[in-house]
């Protein structure tokens, strides 16, 4: 037993000003004795005598301390030691032979959950005493002994009178291999006095260092530092809390010291100075010198082990990093301390039959909600935005204590599957995020198992931490709860629809969830959105699918932010708002929503099931996954660019059932929209082609609604909706001609003598040639250039069309002023005015009824200016690229060997190479945190182009040419027929009925009629929502 003493008044002084007036810095010279009997010198005794007792020590007799202990103390110690009051002795019991971890009686669980540990310096050379032998004080009111040992580290816990916890560790008997790379004393896993308080639990508070500190020292709880709050992130519940971020000056290999505040007197290289405050340069360098670069510390020692397969499958339970465990508030269950890896060697459809299973099923838990997050190569910011949004939603479910379904342990009923499309496509820093959360570990996965190719790598872990889009860690102190995660890293890139097949056909049959939710990385569900989606299924047993409101990310509150300064973002914001307010609500009332956005939608799992013959929604949904060449018609291939539309139709028209689809206004998901023109054009190419051919598919199979299990009233609404969709599709087909006809009529009408505009005829001819030339240029660009390679050409076309729109709007105002003046004398003019008022009045009134009118102010003008871009450029590019429907790399049949293989042995086991040392696992964890902090440049290999079969390309290009020819000719014929009349006399005072005048009236009435139908549907939706609460 080793005894040492301290002044009884020290604790009182510390409690008064939260600073220890008796800072104590241990030194090896305080250790005296010989052999197994080693004593610690009391630094407060001026005589240097030691209080001693027996203490088992690995140290030799070579160094009996003879130096005066006062010589190594800082000046403050030398000044106060003479004034030290009576001594009070505490005891610590340490038994290095004890291999079991023991706890001090009488201390609460919070003591151990809050105590941190620090790695000591390397062991001394032979015949030398260790410079890292530390002492720690126990509370004056406690005499209970404390002993502990974890893998050779003996931890001395201390608690000040003010209730501040700390700990020190002393290594004994470590391998030289591990000691060479040991972390410095103030490692990121230790807890010291913090410059900023970070809302610890009430059981412990931030306080002083275990030894006290000299003036000027500022410790950080590495790797965190306080930063200015970013109000762009929707973290309402954290508004009162300071933010924590990964600091660049942490113990992870930074240049400015080992976890110290670089602005303090002891930050940076000053800690390793030749003659520091602590005197001895060897002492300073041992404890506070700069750590070697992280890259030089990588050991990656792997050991070959024989592992018995589980029913023929490779399944490993891997311990999580030590540092991660110190952050956790729950450590009792295996799901928090081990990560489960499964090497899946079968097709998704055979997952259950090949004896694979999932952790929640092993625990016997019922899965109420199963959430799929699909991603491809998105970066860590988009991933964390989605991930943290889901975690906050799960926390809300657990806060509903009065719910029969949810409550305190509601997180056990929610499982989140993160499915990444291609191991070599995933963003490296997303893997760092998952590693920081404990979900992913490098070096575990394998390419082959007993001669079978691995199709997907499954990592299962229940995390208690989250990382938001600012890369700030959040945990239980922010009200978050654990989340069960299944990370499916597909070996090959096989498109998003294949990711959904893993979700629906592999994982769902194991967990049998009630409701499934589909999310894309980059979409952030707002705090209660997932609950509102789930509630729509709970209230109505006939609901098979539901979606929320998809909002464009504007980086501001109430949908108003700096991104609206980008006209592309503003136009998309207006488009999203009108679609949600008018289209989704109308379709919801009828019972069939043409598309539940894959970015944020929900489905009842039982409604998705196929019948006994294998026919049903999921069978139709996955039909187009492996279509190749001319064996697949162009309609089917393009249709599966909008695969979510197929799933919606198959649900609503399912034979013998009466499933309906609902829009849930309260469930909001915020998503990034393209900010650049090339990305915008490429995205809309997929959307337009997919939606067009999916609409053709739905119209062709309208009879399935009649054979469904809906009642007569619902069937009538569904048939009417099909007719409504057909009329809209026809109108959109002739959109290219309609816009040009209106431009030609409005501008040519200014040539009427009553306007008294000289030279306007010549100007109009010039503008009309500019218009037609831009349209022809758009065809040429679309046929021969990718938007990414012709960015400025496309921007020039967008600007020209916007200027032409301005001219057309000026002409429209002048013509409208004349129309208003002649309303009483000409019925046709009156119909024009009424149609225009009805169209724009619907936008205004419906937005006001929905309590969401801001988009009319912030985004309407931008949408008008970009309207010709939507009608001309986007449609031209989409139709001219019907042959391009691929999402990824088809035909990728190569087998990678970079992860290694699992080889069978003669003893019925397999030989596998794994990182076994805990230090290697911990080092990999530190690397992940370091990568998130520094964000190193990602170097990707050259993208390989997928090989296309000649007949496949010929077939699709031939279809493309036929469709474009039919579309262009039909629009040209319509324009020529209408404009063959007297366009200049459309608004003439002479009156009379002309072809152009009749055409304008019919188009305006049609647009107004469609708007009124949507307005009626929107109003009915709001009424039903109000009645149902």
From Swiss-Prot:
The keyword Cytoplasm does not apply. Residues 191-202 have a biased composition (Basic and acidic residues). PANTHER family: CHITIN SYNTHASE (PTHR22914), CHITIN SYNTHASE 2 (PTHR22914:SF38). Induction: Expression is up-regulated in the mycelial form and shows a maximal expression in the log phase at about 14-18 h of incubation. The keyword Transmembrane applies. The chain crosses the membrane at residues 723-743, 760-780, 796-816, 830-850, 860-880, 963-983, 998-1018. Polymerizes chitin, a structural polymer of the cell wall and septum, by transferring the sugar moiety of UDP-GlcNAc to the non-reducing end of the growing chitin polymer. Keywords: Cell membrane, Cell wall biogenesis/degradation, Cytoplasmic vesicle, Glycoprotein, Glycosyltransferase, Membrane, Transferase, Transmembrane, Transmembrane helix. It is a multi-pass membrane protein. This is Chitin synthase 3. Belongs to the chitin synthase family. Class I subfamily. Its EC number is 2.4.1.16. One of its GO terms (molecular function) is chitin synthase activity. The lineage of its organism: Eukaryota, Fungi, Dikarya, Basidiomycota, Ustilaginomycotina. Residues 46-71 have a biased composition (Low complexity). Residues 76-91 have a biased composition (Polar residues). It is found in: Cell membrane; Cytoplasmic vesicle membrane. Glycans are attached at residues 37, 401, 514, 527, 689.
